[in-house]
């Protein structure tokens, strides 16, 4: 605490502040504080004033020093009462509020708070999911793509979401179009509506069932959404990669140890507090003979095995994953096929980026995906526990039974993968993966009562004939073959734990087939025309250097590096208050940085004294 000219200025630690709207951006300063900061309050002695009048050169120098002191003090003091100009956008409002800055001042180049970027990102974020589940994305690690200073300011603004643009919307549509070409969506809306309506009718008849024994029929919560994502963007996609040589939109993740500046490679490290969950979605993976891309003999062997080993329903083989996984891995080892990893960038004009840093960031994005896939394919046990940790960090119970609606939806869309496994779960049989088989909980799962029509409903003697006729009439699938054998009380319910087990085994199939070729496709978002493809050779040393740099940024262990290309500033939401964008001199920048540095020091001192 310091006393200055009869006014007490107390350095206060940073406290959470909400990002206000543009109509709430007026800040103020009291008349007393305004006077205390005026040049008349620098407390010059009478002798000094006489000397200044007789010695112009000394006067000039001292006034300059006083102005410097004034600037430093002013940059430390927060405005309170006098009306100040509004900030031009919510991002600026956020960072000025969080950093307690005077809106008349430029943004400092130095973080004046006690929070490192990752801590701040995990506590002050407009997207509350990052507060509930602290994590980073692959794109968040690419801090040097445009301007590190902008990335830095975005974090401390509270990660304010920028409005979606027309180009972004078109890009999203193109990604969905490319995904549907390989993974056509099966619309189960009508089936789900029928099941919900039927369940509502039956619920009125089930007044004798104790609440604690009820199996959840309808649940559209986050656990269910994650289950669908794992089933479709992991299990189905990896199976498609084995059977059809390509897949799009595959979920990947890793755990970045910010202290060691490297990704975790053993399951014991996963739960450490310094291990940060990093998630990403790889746009496209191709599985091919790199020296002869037209070679399809591996897939002929895979399909030959599947067609001969498994029964079919509607000309679709019902694959037993317990048998398929070890056999597929053995077949893959007989061929020199490799995975290649591609990121798709959409462009609103028929040209690729000219900025080298943007091109480099895109390259490293593919390196991250390649590295994640490598980590997830090395050891199925590591991947299994990695997925379990992923779900638990999101607050999910991995042993919670999935709702009936989710289970029947997954069965309808992907019965070729899940039917045989669901039979095993229903009968309480092992699936052949010991980490799951040894820990799966035996919980009664009522997969029978809800699959009746109200006109023939019975708890004691369920009759499914009319129900099966009704649901088969919706889309013509042989439900009598894929549903009837499952209509019982299951001994082991379907859970996130089960999905983690199968996903980890599918990753491991590719253990010896990870390639080093990555690429970035640039496509015109209006037509999907391929404008250019940049091909890269994965280099671990180069990648690790990038990981270390990103780790130091998020750990607050290095200074941020502003862009040298000031033409980029015109696209930045912080331009109007950025000293770099304003072309300020080094001396001016340093002077305006001293105050925030002092504020940071005082914050740290006060925090230490309280701790």
From Swiss-Prot:
Subcellular location: Mitochondrion
InterPro entries referenced in this protein's UniProt entry, alphabetically: EXOV (IPR019190)
Location of the region described as Disordered in the Swiss-Prot/TrEMBL record: 19-42
Chief localisation class: mitochondrion
Keyword Zinc: no
A single Gene Ontology CC term: mitochondrion
Keywords from the UniProt entry: 4Fe-4S, DNA-binding, Exonuclease, Hydrolase, Iron, Iron-sulfur, Magnesium, Metal-binding, Mitochondrion, Nuclease, Transit peptide
Pfam family of the protein (one): Exo5
A Gene Ontology molecular function term of the record: 4 iron, 4 sulfur cluster binding
Single biological process term from Gene Ontology: interstrand cross-link repair
Cofactor(s) the protein needs: Mg(2+); [4Fe-4S] cluster
Binding site for [4Fe-4S] cluster: 147, 569, 572, 578
Biased composition (Basic and acidic residues): 21-35
Cofactor note as given: Binds 1 [4Fe-4S] cluster.
Keyword presence, Hydrolase: yes
PANTHER family for this protein: EXONUCLEASE V
Known function: Single strand DNA specific 5'exonuclease involved in mitochondrial DNA replication and recombination. Releases dinucleotides as main products of catalysis. Has the capacity to slide across 5'double-stranded DNA or 5'RNA sequences and resumes cutting two nucleotides downstream of the double-stranded-to-single-stranded junction or RNA-to-DNA junction, respectively.
Protein family per UniProt: Belongs to the EXO5 family.
Subunit structure: Monomer.
Name of this protein: Exonuclease V, mitochondrial
């Amino acid at each position: 605490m310091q006393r200055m000219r009869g006014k007490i200025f107390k350095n206060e630690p940073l406290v959470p502040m909400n990002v206000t709207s543009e109509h709430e951006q007026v800040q103020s300063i009291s008349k007393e504080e305004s006077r205390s900061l005026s040049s008349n309050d620098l407390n010059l002695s009478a002798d000094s004033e006489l000397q200044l009048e007789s010695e112009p050169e000394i006067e000039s120098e001292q006034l300059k020093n006083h102005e410097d002191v004034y600037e430093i003090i002013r940059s430390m003091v927060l405005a309170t009462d006098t009306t100040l100009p509004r900030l031009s956008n919510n991002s600026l409002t956020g960072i000025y509020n969080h950093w307690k800055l005077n809106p008349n001042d430029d943004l400092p180049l130095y973080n004046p708070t006690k929070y490192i970027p990752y801590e701040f990102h995990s506590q002050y974020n407009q997207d509350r999911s990052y507060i509930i589940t602290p994590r980073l994305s692959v794109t968040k690690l690419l801090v040097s793509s445009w301007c590190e200073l902008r990335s830095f300011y975005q974090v401390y603004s509270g990660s304010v979401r920028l409005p979606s643009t027309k180009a972004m919307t078109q890009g999203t549509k193109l990604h969905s179009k490319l995904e549907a070409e390989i993974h056509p969506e099966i619309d189960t809306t009508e089936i789900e509506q029928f099941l919900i309506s039927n369940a509502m009718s039956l619920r009125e008849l089930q007044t004798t069932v104790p609440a604690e024994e009820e199996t959840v029929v309808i649940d559209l919560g986050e656990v269910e959404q994650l289950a669908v994502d794992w089933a479709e963007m992991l299990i189905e996609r990896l199976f498609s990669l084995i059977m059809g040589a390509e897949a799009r939109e595959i979920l990947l993740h890793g755990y970045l140890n910010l202290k060691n500046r490297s990704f975790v490679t053993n399951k014991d490290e996963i739960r450490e507090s310094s291990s940060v969950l990093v998630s990403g979605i790889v746009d496209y993976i191709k599985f091919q003979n790199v020296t002869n891309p037209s070679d399809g003999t591996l897939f002929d062997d895979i399909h030959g095995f599947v067609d001969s080993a498994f029964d079919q329903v509607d000309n679709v083989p019902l694959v037993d994953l317990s048998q398929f996984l070890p056999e597929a891995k053995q077949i893959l080892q007989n061929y020199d096929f490799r995975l290649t990893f591609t990121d798709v960038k959409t462009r609103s004009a028929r040209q690729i980026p000219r900025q080298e840093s943007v091109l480099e960031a895109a390259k490293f994005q593919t390196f991250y995906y390649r590295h994640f896939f490598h980590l997830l394919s090395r050891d199925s046990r590591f991947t299994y526990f990695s997925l379990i940790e992923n779900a638990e960090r999101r607050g999910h119970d991995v042993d919670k039974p999935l709702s009936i609606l989710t289970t029947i939806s997954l069965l309808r869309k992907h019965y070729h993968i899940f039917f045989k496994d669901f039979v095993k779960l229903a009968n309480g049989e092992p699936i052949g993966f010991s980490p799951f088989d040894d820990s799966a909980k035996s919980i009664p799962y009522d997969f029978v009562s809800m699959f009746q029509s109200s006109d023939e409903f019975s708890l004691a003697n369920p009759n499914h004939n009319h129900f099966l006729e009704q649901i088969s009439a919706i889309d013509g699938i042989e439900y009598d073959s894929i549903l009837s054998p499952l209509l019982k009380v299951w001994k082991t319910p379907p859970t996130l734990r089960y999905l983690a087990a199968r996903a980890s085994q599918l990753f491991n199939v590719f253990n010896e087939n990870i390639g080093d070729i990555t690429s970035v496709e640039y496509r015109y978002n209006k037509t999907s025309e391929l404008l250019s493809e940049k091909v890269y050779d994965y280099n671990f040393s180069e990648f690790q250097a990038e990981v270390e740099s990103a780790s130091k940024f998020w750990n607050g262990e290095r200074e941020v590096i502003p862009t040298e290309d000031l033409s980029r500033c015109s696209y930045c939401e912080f331009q109007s208050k950025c000293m770099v964008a304003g072309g300020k001199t080094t001396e001016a920048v340093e002077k305006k940085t001293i105050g925030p540095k002092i504020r940071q020091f005082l914050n740290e001192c006060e925090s230490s004294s309280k701790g």
